[in-house]
Amino acid sequence: MTSTFRHVALIGKYHAPSASAPSENASNALERIADFLRRQGCEVVLDTQSALHAGLTDYPTLDVDGLGRHCDLGLVVGGDGTMLGVSRHLAQYGTPLIGVNQGRLGFVTDIALEDFEATLTPMLQGEYEEDLRPLMCARVIRDGQCVFEALAMNDVVVNRGGTSGMVELRIEVGGRFVSNQRADGLIVATPTGSTAYALSAGGPMMHPSIPAWVMAPIAPHNLSNRPIVLSDANEVTIEVVAGRDVSANFDMQSLASLQHGDRILVSRAHHSVRFLHPKGWNYFATLRKKLGWNEGGA
C-alpha cells in the first residue's frame, strides 16, 4: 500500500565531529530506515547534520527548518533528548513526529528500533494515535529588555551554581504574588516534563491531556514549600532576588549568570508538538513499561 505521507524527514541522533568515525550503529539505523521508507513510496529527506555525521550521501538534505516547510512527517531516531531539540523547531510548522528509540528510557521516542518495520508500516498507512503536547515559551527580562528567549517541551529550571548557596526567588502566577522561596532552585514543568526532573523533586506525574504545569522547588529551605499544579493559562514569573551564579535552563538550552532583578517569564507557547504513536498506544502503558510498574505482578 502507498504511504499516507509523501515527504518524510529523517533526523538522527548525532554528535559533533571528532577524530573517531561516526557511530556505525547510528549510521546503519538511519540507512535501514531510509531504505524502508523509500520502499514504502516515501520521498526521504535527511537533516543536513544527520546525513553529514552518519556519512549518508544518497538522499537529499535540508536543515531542520527546511524539513518543516517541505515534509509532512518527521521521523526522529534517537532518544528523548534528540526529540526535544527537533520538536521545538518543527512545532511551528505543525509537522507530526514519530520517535524511534535509540536512547534509554524513551518516553516520547516509543518505537523500538528492532521492531521499526512492523510498527511503522501501518502507521504510514494512516493507522496511528495522535498526541498533542504543549510547549512553554520562556523569556528572560533584564532592565526591561528581553535578553534571552527559548521554547521548552519539558521544563524551565532556575537553579543555583554548583559551589554557591541557596537562591532566593520571588514567584508570581498570573500577576499575583505567591511567595519568596529560598531553595536550590525551582522547576516549572509541562505534563511531558512532569516525568523528568520535576518527578525527582517530588512533583506529580500529569497526564499529557491536562492543560496544566507543575511548579516544584528543588531542596527548599522551608519544607512547607511543596510542588503545586497550576493552570497553564497563567504566566509564571520568577525573579532572582538573591544568590550567586544563578542559571536558567530551558530543556537543554542554558543561560548562565543570571543577575539579581532578572525575571524569567514562562507562558504557554502558541504551538504544540504533534506526536504520532502506534494504534492502541496509551499513556499508562508507557508509564508501566518505562517506570517498571507491575514487575513481577499479574
From Swiss-Prot:
Main location: cytoplasm
Keyword annotations: ATP-binding, Cytoplasm, Kinase, NAD, NADP, Nucleotide-binding, Transferase
Coiled-coil residues: none
GO CC annotations on file: cytoplasm
EC numbers on record: 2.7.1.23
Compartments it resides in: Cytoplasm
Known catalytic reactions: NAD(+) + ATP = ADP + NADP(+) + H(+)
Record bears the keyword NADP: yes
GO MF assignments: ATP binding; metal ion binding; NAD binding; NAD+ kinase activity
Protein family (similarity comment): Belongs to the NAD kinase family.
Full protein name: NAD kinase
Lineage: Bacteria, Pseudomonadati, Pseudomonadota, Betaproteobacteria, Burkholderiales
Gene: nadK
